[in-house]
């Protein structure tokens, strides 16, 4: 629903399933604004080249990334596979946060909690409180 109003009808069923569906991939690709630049994460490795190819054919510039432990974000606990899309083509790169001097953190150290806990942590970070989560 964030990217295309027509997909809002699938939202209740997707939420009830509680797992990733094809709509996780279709959503960003169905964006009616047709962005010329995009950065999008995918959790399933098999979808990375598909999404990169679609973006390349559309003339988009951007990145399709996946943390190599299977998250749809750039990882701080391991390397990430990044498809860089530009000029109608894409190339695959590995991103290692330690190459930038960022200390590796186990995935367990950055996993949030329930909504109440996450709000508490966000408020602490915005208030300037220092700590492990604030340093991410």
PLM region spans:
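Glycine-rich anion-binding loops and their surrounding alpha/beta cores
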Residues: 1-136
């Amino acid at each position: 629903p964030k990217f295309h109003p027509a997909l809002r009808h699938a939202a209740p069923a997707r939420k009830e399933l509680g797992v990733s569906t094809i709509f996780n991939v279709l959503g960003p690709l169905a964006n009616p604004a047709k962005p010329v630049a995009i950065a999008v994460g995918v959790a399933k490795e098999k979808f990375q080249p598909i999404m990169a190819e679609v973006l390349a054919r559309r003339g988009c510039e951007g990145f399709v990334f996946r943390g190599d432990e299977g998250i749809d974000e750039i990882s701080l606990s391991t390397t990430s596979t990044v498809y860089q899309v530009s000029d109608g083509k894409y190339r695959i790169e590995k991103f290692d946060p330690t190459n930038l001097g960022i200390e590796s953190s186990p995935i367990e150290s950055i996993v949030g909690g329930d909504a109440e806990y996450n709000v508490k942590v966000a408020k602490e970070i915005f208030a300037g409180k220092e700590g492990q989560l604030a340093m991410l």
